[in-house]
Every structure is written in structure tokens, then in C-alpha cells.
């Protein structure tokens, strides 16, 4: 018989820097998961992505074992790095925080494709463009 999933925990952690301190410790500890085992496995899988925030989905099973799936970095982080800014505009309707090209937008959309609910790259580009617009990032041809 397959193991029963008792909880799915979603966290966003810095790549290669997971440690037992909050938010990891309390989130996993209350389900009886071996926190250090998760931290070592997560850090090993994400050491090549240093500097990014990586969303992770942890499935905890009834026997206290776990599996986890790494997602792509949040669109806002990808956009900030692409535009070379530290934060989005305070008022995105009036301010322009940065600029990216359509080619860069397509590249970001292709990166995010596995995690987006989009059937084509064009649809994914529209989703990422909406995120860019809300952050005050202008898209140029």
C-alpha cells in the first residue's frame, strides 16, 4: 500500500541556505520530520542556484518521511534581476522602476513555464508581463 500524505508544506527558502531556524524548523518539526535531513537534501539540490529564493513543496507522509519538489524562482525575483533593480516601483501606474526587452521577457516566460498554468510561451509571456507591469517594469521591443 502506498504511503499516505498527511501534509503538504509550501515554503520559499534561499537556495543552498536552508537551516533548522524558522521558518523551516517549526513548519517541519510539528509534523515530526527530520529537519536536518531536509536541510541537507535541499541545500545539496539548490547549491548551484545561489542567490535565488526557491519555492519548495514538501509532502509529509504518515511514517514521518518526506519528499520535496523544487519550483522555479518567483516571477518577481526573476524580473528584478533581469531589470537590475532591488525592488519594484511604489506606485506602478506612475513610476517606472526598470526596463526589460521583449526577448528577455520571452526568456523569463520559458524559465517559468513548468510552474505556470499556461499552454504556450505567448500566454506565459502575458502572465509575466502582467507581473512586470504591477512592479513598474516597462517592457520595450
Swiss-Prot record:
Family of the protein in this entry: Belongs to the universal ribosomal protein uL11 family.
UniProt keyword rRNA-binding present: yes
SUPFAM superfamilies: Ribosomal L11/L12e N-terminal domain (SSF54747), Ribosomal protein L11, C-terminal domain (SSF46906)
Organism: Fusobacterium nucleatum subsp. nucleatum (strain ATCC 25586 / DSM 15643 / BCRC 10681 / CIP 101130 / JCM 8532 / KCTC 2640 / LMG 13131 / VPI 4355)
Gene Ontology molecular functions: large ribosomal subunit rRNA binding; structural constituent of ribosome
Assembly behavior: Part of the ribosomal stalk of the 50S ribosomal subunit. Interacts with L10 and the large rRNA to form the base of the stalk. L10 forms an elongated spine to which L12 dimers bind in a sequential fashion forming a multimeric L10(L12)X complex.
Keyword terms of this UniProt record: Methylation, Ribonucleoprotein, Ribosomal protein, RNA-binding, rRNA-binding
Primary role: Forms part of the ribosomal stalk which helps the ribosome interact with GTP-bound translation factors.
Pfam family, one: Ribosomal_L11_N
Gene that produces this protein: rplK
Ribosomal protein among keywords: yes
A biological process term (GO) from this entry: translation
Protein name: Large ribosomal subunit protein uL11
Post-translational modification, as annotated: One or more lysine residues are methylated.
Amino acid at each position: 500500500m502506498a504511503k499516505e500524505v498527511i501534509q503538504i508544506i509550501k515554503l520559499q527558502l534561499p537556495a543552498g541556505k536552508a537551516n533548522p531556524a524558522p521558518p523551516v524548523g517549526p513548519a517541519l518539526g510539528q509534523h515530526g520530520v527530520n529537519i536536518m535531513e531536509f536541510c541537507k537534501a535541499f541545500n545539496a539540490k539548490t547549491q548551484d542556484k545561489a542567490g535565488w529564493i526557491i519555492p519548495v513543496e514538501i509532502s509529509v507522509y504518515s511514517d514521518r518521511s518526506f519528499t520535496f519538489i523544487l519550483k522555479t524562482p518567483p516571477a518577481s525575483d526573476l524580473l528584478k534581476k533581469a531589470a537590475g533593480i532591488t525592488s519594484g516601483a511604489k506606485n506602478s501606474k506612475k513610476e517606472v522602476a526598470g526596463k526589460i526587452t521583449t526577448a528577455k521577457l520571452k526568456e523569463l516566460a520559458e524559465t517559468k513555464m513548468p510552474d505556470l498554468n499556461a499552454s504556450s510561451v505567448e500566454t506565459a509571456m502575458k502572465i509575466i508581463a502582467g507581473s512586470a507591469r504591477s512592479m513598474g517594469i516597462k517592457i520595450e521591443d
